[in-house]
């Protein structure tokens, strides 16, 4: 089963990009996969978390991208926060760098290509 965790807001602090969601992260132990996908239909980057019996998708939509760009430029880690629990999204910078390079000048991503250029490139 795959669960979607939508990021509602983000804040850049001295030490990290804090990604906040409305989900309760208690219960199953989660670990960062170091892998990301692109959801070009919904203009989102998707970070994959692993748990014992499933994957969870952390959805980073367009309204979060300016903070994500700043964290990327400063190489600050991204940390998912919810209900007192935190998970560092390890490998996010490397994956995002790869995806951004792949999206650049690639019409297969449709309107997302232009949106990515406006924020990241």
Swiss-Prot record:
Lineage: Bacteria, Bacillati, Bacillota, Bacilli, Bacillales
Taxonomic source organism: Bacillus velezensis (strain DSM 23117 / BGSC 10A6 / LMG 26770 / FZB42)
Pfam families the record matches: UPF0738 (PF19785)
Family: Belongs to the UPF0738 family.
Matches recorded under InterPro entries: UPF0738
Protein name listed in UniProt: UPF0738 protein RBAM_011600
